């Protein structure tokens, strides 16, 4: 017969080549995919497979037993219960080799048990003997000490009669020695008896353990508890077994009952039902039959708490956690209150809180990962193997108006800065530039304080940070923040000292200020390159590019070019005609048009790709920024973008992420609500400024929301009712009308339907293109809600010279105005020795019997104080007025 190859044989057997090679290897034949197979080798493989697949001979015995049990019922009537017990046993025929192996193992085990038993007996004997010797020695020492004490006492007592009682003392001493010897002999006998009992007990224990571990038959029956199908309770089965034993025992039921009684040494306490059954069996009845036992609950409460393994997912309700720990929900709530958290039984808590509660109650916690589907989708990706050099990703960071975008404009030879509202960057711009020495990808970040998160994302997605510092301005707050972001991301920094062409430029000052924050130039022994540039004149631009490429060579940046792409979302927005648009920076692999991408909570197929110039491209490699269309929604800036194989699985992962994010968010909100419940009860009235915010890109929504929420104070709070990307729609206007909110549009406009609702409801709609103006106007609106500050201003002082009595007003103070003006009906204070003794209102003010409204400095007048008559000569009346000062938010 002609030999065939492994591949041909695999095709004939309809199996894979790798599995066939593995089967040959299991049979002891080493083959590769292209080797030939002889007929003898085929037969060897077939014999191996037959031997492997042939099952051992089995014998299954089934037994079914039916019986009737009479149980006494109420009213003296008995009730018959039909009992059926099914048993199944399977006997497996042992292989001869396996039987020999089991016999050898049994013999070895018997020898080991015998050796252990002998060692245990010898050890017990030695320990008992040593213990007896120690006890005898200690007893002798104690006797000797007592004897010495008694002798000393006797000696002191009879010291004056020593001559007369010498003989008696000697006789007493001999008697005591005899008693000590007798006590020592008794102690040795007691120790020997204890030693024998201990050795006998150890031998009995070893013999019992050996009998328990001994195998009685090579054909071991395997019995599964699940094969019992019992149609009544456990109590009925026990009653049937006891009835069978009594019938077999006949007249000897008294002896059987005595033998069935539990031993005294049993560590488990017998239940009440067991004791009653035992008494009934001893008493018996007519004809040797015992009375039927009463049905009693035989459950015994566990003596100690059971520690369980509690599996906790990312979120869990309090009730589910209590069920997993087998405790009441009230106990879990009590434990949470001890830890300082309030919860209800249906409240969802996060994984960390549940772990603390379970560990506090003494259970072992197993944290379950619920993202197996996500991990499976991520692992099923073709990522390629060979890494190739890639272009560096450079982020330009610095303070506002220090010339970041102008510097990038000169490099790109475009005028993007003129297109930015107010001349400040409000988006992350991603561009790649071709130079003579290679390609560089630039990310331009905003410098305003509101865009902190956008700068942080830029630092995380970058390889090199170019820190732009104006030579005339020096280090500013956002410059320091950019340094912190770069250090947190562990990214090298290249410093571009801009505006070097200005007369007031001072580069040395910039170096000194940056050195305070750990940015040292190379000439000072540091690691950062300093380049002097001018974005207007173009000075030093080539040196800056060379410094960037030099730093990139030092980093040896590489990425896999072939395979499925992955990257990060730099920016995202909603376009009215194109739908959700995301700016993606590819990190590795190649992104093609038509790929299925998973991006945070969103997914979709790439319908179109455009570069930063707006031109259509079919693919994008590492370090290339592109805009992609076709996602299911607007992703959050900073989300990971991953190309996957299956769109259905991508949708499942995205929905799972959305649900999990919602659960965790609700759990945290509920937790904060309950924790702040008492604080909210004690707070006074708090005014709220409700805002519905719409912006052009996701990064702007994020930055504006953070800036507005930071404006909140104890009296006025900013509440973002709704936010999103895209134009203002009718839904947004309806939401603003329902919540009495201000509509804010940042670089977006309202459509026709929204304008109708706004006009009908007279809503406050405001458009902005610069974030400074937006924040200032919201501050002004909040300042209008602040309650004014009340301030007391003293307007006059009058000294009491004399006191007169008036039937109408009581005591009238004759005063001289020493300072300011005294006005009628103003609040006053009466001061005596510079201490306020009364505060009230000026009721009557007269000058020469005429009522006047005010009296000026240096004039005399009569003052009547309302509801106060204890005015004395020498008192000072202080007149003041309360003025309101409008507060503003800083």
Curated annotation (Swiss-Prot):
One of its GO terms (cellular component) is cytosol. PROSITE patterns: G_TR_2 (PS51722), IF2 (PS01176). GTP binds at residues 398-405, 444-448, 498-501. Residues 67-81 have a biased composition (Polar residues). Its main location: cytoplasm. GO terms for molecular function: GTP binding; GTPase activity; guanosine tetraphosphate binding; translation initiation factor activity. Transmembrane segments: none annotated. InterPro entries: DNA-bd_dom_put_sf, EF-G-like_DII, EFTu-like_2, IF2_assoc_dom_bac, IF2_II, IF2_N, P-loop_NTPase, Small_GTP-bd. Pfam families: EF-G_D2 (PF22042), GTP_EFTU (PF00009), GTP_EFTU_D2 (PF03144), IF-2 (PF11987), IF2_assoc (PF08364), IF2_N (PF04760). The modification N6-acetyllysine is found at residue 808. Gene3D superfamilies: P-loop containing nucleotide triphosphate hydrolases, Putative DNA-binding domain, N-terminal subdomain of bacterial translation initiation factor IF2, Translation factors, Translation initiation factor IF- 2, domain 3. Keywords: Acetylation, Cytoplasm, GTP-binding, Initiation factor, Nucleotide-binding, Protein biosynthesis. Residues 389-558 form the tr-type G domain. Residues 423-427 are annotated as: G2. Residues 398-405 are annotated as: G1. Residues 45-304 are annotated as: Disordered. The keyword Acetylation applies. Residues 252-266 have a biased composition (Basic residues). Residues 498-501 are annotated as: G4. Residues 92-217, 267-280 have a biased composition (Basic and acidic residues). Signal peptide: none annotated. Belongs to the TRAFAC class translation factor GTPase superfamily. Classic translation factor GTPase family. IF-2 subfamily. One of the essential components for the initiation of protein synthesis. Protects formylmethionyl-tRNA from spontaneous hydrolysis and promotes its binding to the 30S ribosomal subunits. Also involved in the hydrolysis of GTP during the formation of the 70S ribosomal complex. This is Translation initiation factor IF-2.
């Amino acid at each position: 017969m002609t030999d065939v190859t492994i591949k041909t044989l695999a095709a004939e057997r309809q199996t894979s080549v790798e599995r066939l090679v593995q089967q040959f290897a299991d049979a002891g034949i080493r083959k590769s995919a292209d080797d030939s197979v002889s007929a003898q080798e085929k037969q060897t493989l077939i014999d191996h497979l037959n031997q492997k697949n042939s099952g051992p001979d089995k014998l299954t015995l089934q037994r079914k037993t039916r019986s009737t049990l009479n149980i006494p019922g109420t009213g003296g009537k008995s009730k018959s219960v039909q009992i059926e017990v099914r048993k199944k046993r399977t006997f497996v025929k042992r292989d001869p080799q396996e039987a020999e192996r089991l016999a050898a193992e049994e013999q070895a085990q018997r020898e080991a048990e015998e050796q252990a038993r002998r060692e245990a007996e010898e050890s017990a004997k030695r320990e008992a003997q040593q213990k007896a010797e120690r006890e005898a020695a200690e007893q002798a020492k104690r006797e000797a000490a007592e004897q010495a004490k008694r002798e000393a006492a006797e000696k002191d007592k009879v010291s004056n009669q020593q001559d007369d009682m010498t003989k008696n003392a000697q006789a007493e001493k001999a008697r005591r020695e005899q008693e000590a010897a007798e006590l020592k002999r008794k102690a040795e006998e007691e120790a020997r008896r204890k030693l024998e009992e201990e050795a006998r007990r150890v031998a009995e224990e070893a013999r019992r353990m050996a009998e328990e571990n001994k195998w009685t038959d090579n054909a071991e029956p395997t019995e599964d508890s699940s094969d019992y199908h019992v149609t009544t309770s456990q109590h009925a089965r026990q009653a049937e077994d006891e009835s069978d034993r009594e019938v077999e025992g006949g007249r000897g039921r008294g002896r059987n009952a005595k033998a069935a009684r539990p031993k005294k040494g049993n560590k488990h306490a017998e239940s009440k039902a067991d004791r009653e059954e035992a008494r009934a069996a001893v008493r018996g009845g007519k004809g040797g039959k015992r009375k039927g036992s009463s049905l009693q609950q035989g459950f015994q409460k566990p003596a100690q708490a059971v520690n369980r393994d509690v599996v906790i997912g990312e979120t869990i309700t309090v009730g589910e956690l209590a069920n997993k720990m087998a405790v009441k929900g009230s106990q879990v709530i009590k434990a949470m209150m001890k830890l300082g958290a309030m919860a209800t039984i249906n409240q969802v808590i996060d994984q960390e809180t549940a772990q603390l509660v379970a560990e506090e109650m003494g259970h072992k916690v197993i944290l379950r990962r619920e993202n197996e589907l996500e991990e499976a989708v991520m692992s099923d990706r073709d990522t390629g193997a060979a890494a190739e050099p890639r272009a560096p990703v450079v982020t330009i960071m610095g303070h506002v108006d220090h010339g970041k975008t102008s510097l990038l404009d000169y490099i790109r030879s475009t005028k993007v800065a003129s297109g930015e509202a107010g001349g400040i960057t409000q988006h992350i711009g991603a561009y790649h530039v071709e130079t003579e020495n290679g390609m560089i990808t630039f990310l331009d970040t905003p410098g305003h304080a509101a865009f902190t998160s956008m700068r942080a994302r830029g630092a995380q997605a970058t390889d090199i940070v170019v820190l732009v510092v104006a030579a005339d301005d020096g280090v500013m707050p956002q410059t320091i923040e950019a340094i912190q972001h770069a250090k947190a991301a562990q990214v090298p920094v290249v410093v571009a000292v801009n505006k070097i062409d200005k007369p007031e430029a001072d580069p040395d000052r910039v170096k000194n200020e940056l050195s305070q924050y750990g940015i040292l130039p190379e000439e000072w022994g540091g690691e950062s390159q300093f380049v002097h540039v001018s974005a207007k004149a173009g000075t030093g631009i080539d040196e800056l590019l060379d410094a960037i490429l030099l730093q990139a060579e030092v980093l040896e940046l590489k990425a896999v070019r072939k395979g499925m792409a992955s990257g990060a979302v730099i920016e995202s927005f909603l376009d009215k005609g194109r739908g959700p648009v995301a700016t993606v920076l590819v990190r590795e692999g190649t992104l093609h048009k038509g790929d299925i991408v998973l991006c945070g909570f969103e997914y979709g197929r790439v319908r179109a790709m455009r570069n930063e110039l707006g031109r259509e491209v079919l693919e994008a490699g590492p370090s290339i920024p592109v805009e992609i269309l076709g996602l299911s929604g607007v992703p959050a800036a900073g989300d990971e973008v991953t190309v996957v194989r299956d769109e259905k699985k991508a949708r499942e992962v995205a929905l799972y992420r959305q649900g999990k994010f919602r659960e965790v968010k609700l759990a945290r909100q509920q937790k904060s609500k309950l924790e702040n419940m008492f604080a909210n009860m004690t707070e006074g009235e708090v005014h709220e400024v409700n805002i519905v915010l719409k912006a052009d890109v996701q990064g702007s929504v994020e930055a504006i929301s953070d800036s507005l929420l930071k404006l909140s104070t104890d009296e006025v709070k900013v509440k973002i009712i709704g936010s999103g990307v895209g134009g203002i729609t009718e839904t947004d206007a309806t939401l603003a009308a329902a919540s009495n909110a201000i509509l804010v549009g940042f670089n977006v406009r309202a459509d026709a339907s929204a304008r109708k609702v706004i006009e009908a409801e007279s809503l406050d709609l405001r458009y902005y293109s610069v974030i400074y103006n937006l924040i200032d106007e919201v501050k002004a609106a909040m300042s209008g809600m602040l309650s004014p500050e009340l301030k007391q201003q003293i307007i006059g002082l009058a000294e009491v010279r004399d006191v007169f009595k008036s039937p109408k007003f009581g005591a009238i103070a004759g005063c001289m105005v020493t300072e300011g003006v005294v006005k009628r009906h103003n609040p006053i204070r009466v001061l005596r020795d510079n201490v306020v003794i009364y505060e009230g209102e000026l009721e009557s003010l007269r000058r020469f019997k005429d009522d006047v409204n005010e009296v000026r400095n240096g004039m005399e007048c009569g003052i009547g104080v309302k509801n106060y008559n204890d005015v004395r000569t020498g008192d000072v009346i202080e007149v003041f007025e309360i003025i309101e000062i409008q507060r503003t938010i800083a």
